[in-house]
């Protein structure tokens, strides 16, 4: 019998355990009325290395292609929420609110970390990382809640803005921090040129992908759309990995391009949903299994400072900006809660920092991994409660949410 067979089989068993745990978690979520996203995360954590050790870390890494594909499809759907006719009237509001929320978050996190660590480079980089909001978590909780209204609409736009600004600002600040340290190995302008090329390439790839999907949806029979969307998504993911492009930006742009160039976008999304639902379960179960309770403790004082300062920045910044702009009371009270969840983008950037700058990057990674345990468990609950209290969840859905199916 081949030696690789037991490992391959065990990976499949691990996936089965994750899915069964998620099934039980989803049923429990209906009973206790918590978002299914939280249930899948907790189910993954329970069977993962942090608690029961039913799944080891090596097998979790084998599922990375599934989780990236799930994130890609979620971002494609998020981009499809922004047809220009709908985006124009809300963009001015969202930009003002985004500037207020992100400025407050960056300032509070940077100042707090600087005071407690005395390390300005760590402070500004954590300030940039604090801007990122988990797109998959936020979008899927809003989708599960079937919420509609100003809080939901603004949260969707701000999630996209937060992640774009977080990626760009982190790369720029990381570059400046390295330049000011004694470890400078490349020129500022060459690195800036590389960053510009990466961002431009990601946007161009996303535009091409969105146009391709939209054009060929008009030529192909509907029953072939799912294969076509998956083929393009996987191809785009592969190209992003090959060329080291930020794939989240590519798929967001692809969605925006698709919804503004093709009348088939809503039907394409409904076809995509046939497999996206399963991939989303895998995504959150795997990320739950990756959550390390020990990292939460290892993050220590700086982790607690980061969590407190980021939470205050998101909540107070959104509230102050909404007040200054004269937004409705519901937006002032609840928008900040919808921006607290944090996972994929922040983890990816912190991992990149650890690879490029082992000393400081390792500290950033420890703090982010520890804080993600808090934000990914608390975030979805706050999002659902916020849209519910804002009156944006249909009454019938709010009443029947705890029905076991």
Predicted regions and their residues:
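Membrane-interface junctions of multi-pass transporters
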Residues: 28-35, 46-93, 217-225, 232-306, ...
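Transmembrane alpha-helices that form the ion-translocation and gating core
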Residues: 28-31, 88-147, 211-212, 297-390
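Membrane-interface alpha-helices at helix entry/exit sites of multi-pass transporters
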Residues: 147-168, 185-189, 266-270, 330-336, ...
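Structural signature of hydrophobic alpha-helical transmembrane segments
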Residues: 3-18, 59-76, 119-134, 194-205, ...
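Hydrophobic alpha-helical transmembrane segments in multi-pass integral membrane proteins
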Residues: 54, 107-114, 166-175, 236-248, ...
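Intrinsically disordered, low-complexity non-transmembrane regions of multi-pass membrane transporters
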Residues: 1-9, 154, 183-190, 219-223, ...
């Amino acid at each position: 019998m081949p030696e690789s067979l037991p490992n391959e089989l065990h990976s499949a068993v691990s996936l089965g355990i994750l899915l069964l745990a998620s099934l039980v978690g989803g049923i429990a979520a209906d009973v206790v009325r918590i978002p299914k996203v939280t249930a899948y995360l907790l189910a993954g954590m329970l069977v993962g290395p942090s608690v029961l050790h039913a799944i080891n870390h090596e097998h979790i890494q084998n599922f990375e292609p599934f989780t990236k594909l799930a994130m890609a499809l979620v971002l494609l759907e998020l981009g499809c929420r922004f047809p220009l006719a709908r985006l124009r009237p809300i963009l001015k509001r969202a930009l003002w609110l985004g500037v207020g929320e992100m400025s407050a978050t960056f300032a509070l996190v940077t100042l707090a970390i600087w005071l407690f660590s005395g390390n300005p480079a760590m402070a500004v980089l954590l300030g940039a990382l604090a801007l990122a909001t988990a797109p998959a978590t936020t979008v899927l909780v809003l989708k599960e809640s079937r919420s509609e209204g100003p809080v939901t609409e603004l949260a969707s736009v701000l999630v996209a803005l937060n992640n774009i600004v977080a990626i760009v600002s982190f790369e720029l600040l990381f570059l400046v921090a390295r330049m000011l340290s004694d470890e400078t190995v490349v020129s500022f302008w060459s690195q800036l040129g590389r960053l510009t090329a990466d961002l431009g390439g990601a946007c161009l790839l996303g535009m091409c992908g969105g146009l391709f999907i939209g054009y060929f949806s008009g030529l192909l029979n509907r029953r072939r759309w799912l294969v076509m969307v998956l083929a393009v998504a996987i191809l785009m993911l592969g190209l992003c990995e090959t060329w080291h492009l930020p794939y989240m930006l590519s798929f967001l742009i692809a969605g925006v391009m698709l919804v503004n160039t093709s009348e088939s976008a809503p039907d394409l999304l409904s076809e995509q949903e046939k497999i996206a639902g399963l991939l989303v379960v895998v995504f959150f179960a795997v990320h739950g299994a990756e959550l390390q309770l020990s990292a939460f403790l290892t993050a220590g004082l700086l982790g607690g400072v980061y969590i407190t300062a980021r939470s205050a920045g998101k909540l107070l910044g959104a509230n102050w900006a909404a007040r200054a702009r004269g937004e409705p009371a519901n937006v002032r009270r609840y928008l900040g809660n919808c921006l607290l969840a944090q996972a994929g983008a922040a983890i990816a950037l912190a991992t990149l920092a650890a690879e490029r700058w082992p000393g400081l990057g390792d500290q950033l990674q420890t703090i982010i991994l520890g804080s993600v345990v808090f934000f990914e468990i608390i975030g979805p609950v706050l999002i659902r409660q916020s849209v519910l209290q804002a009156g944006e969840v249909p009454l019938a859905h709010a009443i029947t949410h705890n029905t076991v199916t």
